[in-house]
């Protein structure tokens, strides 16, 4: 099975690691990135003859189109704004395509390519990481396992293993993607209908086992991809919130209210700068902190079973960094699900064609089994909603 991987950063490294170390049947991985240093680091880390690296601009069709010829699956681990064009190139080459998504407008453009992909006999699957991605797959699995679902709550966070100043946070994935999640509107289902609400709102507290204890969660954008449309009319209420150590939401809300998340350029002393780009650069510098990270996930569905009895079903994941192999928890929980889906596409386990909702075509049981094979502790619970969680 032949894969082309766009991006050799943190998540691209995790995807390549998984395809070469865990996925069955991989014959080649071609990694493309504009940064030669990132490619050199990838080659040194993996030390696998099946890996080939190519330095260049992923947005250049003259570079990427020949690389896609003969590939089974193309995976995008670059910033979300590249994904629609890369999907088009993969479709033209007859290769399946998936990405880590995270931006609703870009994903909508990928869905506009569905007929094009179907005609070429390929699948395009956006939003295949942690959230969006795994969270939606697990949430759909829980909700549809009930006769009627009253509430589906998805809570996910990538955090330092212990809170670190100045924001009780460390960079664990793209800073641009993080800011996008914090400022774009969030999709929810309220009273059976899809609605949008502002991000950085509806702050709540929740508890995880020690040493984490009481944490906070708040609305953010893009974490559940197409799940609201898929479950509209089938679930009374659905929302997704990002988990952080307490106090983080108020800090970032202040930055946003001051205009530091605005994308448009501002003029200063004869020059112009985008506040968002400046903020991203500063965050990358100041929040690229040492120490391991952790990923926390809680998916919880409440409703009634086929006998009309109230029931709560939940899945909890607490995943830690693989320090032996230098793979962070966020890399594991973002890159591994994407690589698992890529292998499903290459093996023919996903038979539908066109642009696809990952929650409808990726079997949750198979995903959970593959994650457990990678030593991810996926815990499943079921009980009466009146019982303690």
Feature names for model-found ranges:
Residues 3-8:
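Conserved N-terminal Rossmann-fold NAD(P)-binding element of oxidoreductases
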Residues 11:
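Hydrophobic/small residue at the entry helix of a nucleotide-binding pocket
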Residues 34-38, 104:
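Helix N-cap at the beta1-alpha1 junction of Rossmann-like dinucleotide-binding domains, i.e.
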Residues 46-60:
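Rossmann-fold cofactor-recognition segment
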Residues 58-70:
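Conserved Rossmann-fold cofactor-binding substructure of NAD(P)-dependent oxidoreductases
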Residues 62, 73-90, 105-106:
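Beta-loop-alpha module in the N-terminal Rossmann-like domain of NAD(P)-dependent dehydrogenases
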Residues 101-124:
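Rossmann-fold NAD(P)-binding glycine/threonine-rich loop
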Residues 145-389:
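C-terminal catalytic/substrate-binding lobe primarily of soluble NAD(P)-dependent oxidoreductases
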């Amino acid at each position: 099975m032949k894969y082309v991987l766009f991006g050799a950063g943190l998540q691209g490294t995790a995807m390549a690691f998984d395809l070469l170390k865990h996925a069955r049947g991989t014959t080649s991985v071609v990694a493309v990135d504009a940064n030669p240093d990132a490619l050199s680091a990838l080659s040194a880390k993996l030390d696998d003859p099946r890996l080939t690296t190519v330095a260049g601009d992923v947005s250049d069709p003259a570079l990427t189109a020949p690389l896609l010829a003969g590939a089974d699956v193309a995976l995008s681990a670059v910033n979300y704004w590249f994904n629609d064009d890369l999907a088009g190139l993969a479709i033209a080459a007859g290769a399946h395509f998936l990405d880590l998504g995270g931006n609703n407008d870009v994903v909508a453009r990928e869905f506009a390519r569905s007929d094009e992909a179907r005609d070429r006999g390929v699948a395009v699957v956006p939003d295949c990481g942690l959230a969006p991605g795994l969270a939606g797959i697990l949430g759909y699995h829980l909700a549809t396992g009930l006769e009627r679902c009253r509430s589906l709550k998805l809570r996910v966070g990538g955090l330092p293993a212990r809170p670190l100043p100045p924001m009780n946070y460390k960079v664990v994935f793209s800073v641009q993607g993080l800011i996008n999640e914090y400022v774009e509107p969030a999709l929810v289902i309220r009273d059976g209908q899809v609605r949008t609400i502002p991000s950085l709102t509806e702050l709540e507290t929740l508890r995880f086992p020690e040493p984490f204890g009481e944490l906070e969660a708040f609305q953010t954008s893009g974490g559940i991809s197409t799940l609201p449309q898929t479950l509209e009319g089938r679930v009374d209420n659905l929302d997704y919130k990002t988990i952080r150590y307490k106090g983080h939401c108020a800090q970032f809300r202040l930055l946003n209210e001051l205009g530091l998340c605005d994308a448009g350029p501002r003029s200063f002393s004869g020059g112009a700068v985008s506040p968002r780009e400046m903020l991203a650069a500063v965050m990358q510098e100041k929040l690229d902190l040492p120490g391991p990270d952790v990923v926390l996930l809680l998916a919880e569905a409440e409703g009634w079973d086929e006998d009309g009895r109230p029931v709560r079903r939940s899945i909890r994941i607490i995943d830690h960094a693989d320090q032996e192999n230098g793979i962070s928890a966020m890399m594991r929980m973002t890159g591994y699900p994407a690589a698992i889906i890529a292998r499903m596409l290459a093996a023919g386990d996903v038979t539908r064609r066109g642009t696809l909702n990952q929650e409808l075509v990726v079997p949750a049981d198979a995903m959970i089994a593959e994650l457990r094979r990678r030593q991810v502790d996926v815990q499943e619970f079921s009980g009466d909603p009146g019982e303690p969680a």
